[in-house]
Amino acid sequence: MIEAVSKIVKISGPGLLFASTAIGVSHLIQSTRAGADFGLMIIGFVVLVSVLKYPFFEYGSRYANSTQTSIIDGYKKLGTPILALYLIITVCSMFFVTGAVGFVAAGFFENLFNLEFLGEWSIILLFISCVLILSIGKFNLLDNLIKIIVTILVVSTVLAFSLTVINGPIEPVKDFIPKELWTTTGIFFLLALMGWMPTAIDLSSWNSLWTLEKIKQSKYKPKLKETLLEFRISYLLTGILAIMFVTLGTFIFYGSGEELPNNNSQFAHSIITMYSSVMGNWSYIVIAASAFTVMFGTILAVFDGYSRALNRTVELLFRKNNTNQSKSSRKLYTVFLIILASGSLVTVLQFGDNLKELIDFATILSFVIAPVIAIFNYRLVTGKYLEKSHQPAVWLKILSISGILFLSGFAVYFILLKFIFTNQFSY
């Protein structure tokens, strides 16, 4: 028994880090908005996109365990132009993604400590904290923090969900008219929801980097099935929590006539009130602290993931010695942390106080570039780059092809809808 627990501790971490990046904005914000605006019908789309995206996230962990190199190294094997394209995709999206997550985290920070007067200084303080923690600390610190944070979120969400289901949905206001999903605005929101459900596919490279770092830190090389089991449990957790958040949004907001605010601090207050309304007013401060902790964990994971990915990509593209072990590698990691913080701050300031617009822009951007990364990952785990015994099963390959067709189809549909057929929606 003790040996089994010890093994679980040794392999747990990368999947939970993935869950942390997913739970922050896509669940706490987007899933709640989806339920509040469109009700339980949105759950079908949440489940569908989570299933179709699953293979491409799993392939990051699979490739790392099988080859003992990151999937970014795999992109280099596909050809230098492929790796360069990955770098371009990362640079084009990272400031919007990090800015969106940071903006939400700042809202919960302001709400918790009643610091709305700080304005942009709240996000500056958060970004500085992230850079300091990650540049001074090591993976072990991030790993342990995330385990605590995910536990807090799961417990509080399951409790709130259970109490909400017991109490039942609110009574719709008189003359309530449900929002139509199949309108231009509704479709754009659906694409935004699916873009980060459970998170952006280009973040799959982080799984492989975290898997390798966990092996290095724990000095334990798990079997492939152990690595995949840890990831699958974490992925399933993100799916279940997404359904819970949609349900919470539906039961508490749908039909109430209330609109979730666009200001990040006010939005945070609405989310926390959603919890406390079913758990009791006494829980407000507890939930506020838990929600901020979750968002802080998400922004830490995002900063770490992007900086690791950029670090490894630049090493492979521009350095002859790609050992990834040197002091210069650590310095480069810190440089990317600073660049990421600076660029993301500028992005947030450009969007002003428009929380929904920033999040929707970042999530739709992720959805449009998703098919490219999906194809890269599929080629790596089904071709000559991976041993036959470590390649995915036939059903997973079929699911992958279905996912690529789905993502590609919707990406093309978005481009046609946005730039050719209509000008009704703008950021």
PLM features: residue spans?
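Juxtamembrane transmembrane-helix boundary signature
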Residues: 18, 45-76, 85-96
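Membrane-interface loop-to-helix entry segments
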Residues: 134-164, 181, 362-370, 396, ...
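Extracellular/periplasmic helix-exit of transmembrane alpha-helices
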Residues: 54-64, 211, 236-269
